[in-house]
From Swiss-Prot:
This is Cold shock-like protein CspH. The keyword ATP-binding does not apply. It is found in: Cytoplasm. InterPro entries: Cold_shock_CspA, Cold_shock_domain, CSD, CSD_CS, CSP_DNA-bd, NA-bd_OB-fold.
Length: 70
């Protein structure tokens, strides 16, 4: 089950396409992969940017899906 949330990009590595988002509700950081972003927003994942996303339970813990700038 997914839950729509907002948060701030904490880290993002362009080479690996992976990073972390800190949810606004104070929950544990959520993993993000470049493939979870809308195509035209993939270059905008820089630390400090506010995003909206759906939180899903991935194989390695909380994961972001359907990520876009808020």
């Amino acid at each position: 089950m997914s839950r729509k949330m907002t948060g701030i990009v904490k880290t993002f590595d362009c080479k690996s396409g992976k990073g972390l988002i800190t949810p606004s509700d104070g929950r544990k950081d959520v993993q993000v992969h470049i493939s979870a972003c809308r195509q035209h927003e993939t270059e905008a994942l820089i630390p400090g940017i506010r995003v909206e996303f759906c939180r899903i339970n991935g194989l390695r813990g909380p994961t972001a899906a359907n990520v876009y700038l808020s």
